[in-house]
């Protein structure tokens, strides 16, 4: 196994965890939330995706390397709006595998949390 590297952009955390771990070309991002950008699903989703972009960049990666995404929402009624924002964020890259769930609560009163896994240089153009 390669050396385990911490991925961190210095953002405040709500617990004892590392925002991301990188081993060789495999990248795992802890669940990301954004409660600073606003209290609505649109601003929190956009802010959370921006945090993911920043963490992936810190690992010399990008959203094109994502292979698995898990989305947690406190209201499944957000699903359509989250999909619109997520689709726009992805652009024309191959979408990663994904699951989305409704949960009763998230840390800090967040409305959405997104967990990601990536393999650096996995971007394939069709």
Locations of the language-model features?
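N-terminal presequence-like segments and the immediate start of the first folded domain
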Residues: 1-67, 73-123
